Amino acid sequence: DKTNSIYTYNRDFANAKNPVNMNITAPQPFSGTYVEKTLQAKAYPSVKVCSKVNSGLISFYKDYPQCDFSVYVGAPVSQEVQQTVLPSLQAAIQGKKQSEAANILINFVQTAFDYKTDGDQFGYEKPFFVDELFYYPYSDCEDRAVLYSYLVRTLMGLDVVLLEYPNHMATAVCFDENIDGDYITVSGKT
């Protein structure tokens, strides 16, 4: 029903059939001040990260249209976050079995950040890019799933998939070793 539609230009382009690609494929260079934050895992007090994030990048992400979660998972993480976050976490999992390393990372992701829903924090749904977790005071399940998937892929080299449930999101990890527990099969991998 066109009477209830909003147009920026009321004309149909017959050849315009491709949706807009919102993927961010290269790091976004922004000037701005750096915001630093210290985060610590509760079950592993020696796992401490002093992060640094560019406020200019956060301003860019603040107004970014809400997208499919693959956009957040696939977006590059800033050099600042990579350089300040990854070395401490890499050292914490060095030499550990995959299951132990994954548990250290999930404990960091679940306990170093305070929880609040997007509705409570912003008044609307706002999925985060990885850098945003190190800026805002709160995060929720989909933000943490995106961060955990990044850490597991980057630090452990394992495949992951996001699992979307009603009002919840989690990350499944494809381990190279046998792990007790529930599993799913995606593209022939368990």
Q: Which residue stretches match the model-derived regions?
A:
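Short, intrinsically disordered, charge-balanced linker/junction segments flanking boundaries
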Residues: D1, F134, T185-K189
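Intrinsically disordered, low-complexity N-terminal segments that are enriched in acidic
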Residues: D1-A43
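Long, charge-rich alpha-helical interaction segments
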Residues: T38-I93
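Short low-complexity stretches enriched in small and charged residues
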Residues: I58-P65, Y124-D131, T190
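Secondary-structure boundary elements
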Residues: F69-F134
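Hydrophobic/aromatic-rich core segments of domains that either
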Residues: Q94-G95, D143-T190
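Extracytoplasmic/secreted proteins, especially bacterial periplasmic and envelope-associated proteins
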Residues: E100-I104, F108, Y136, D140-L147, ...
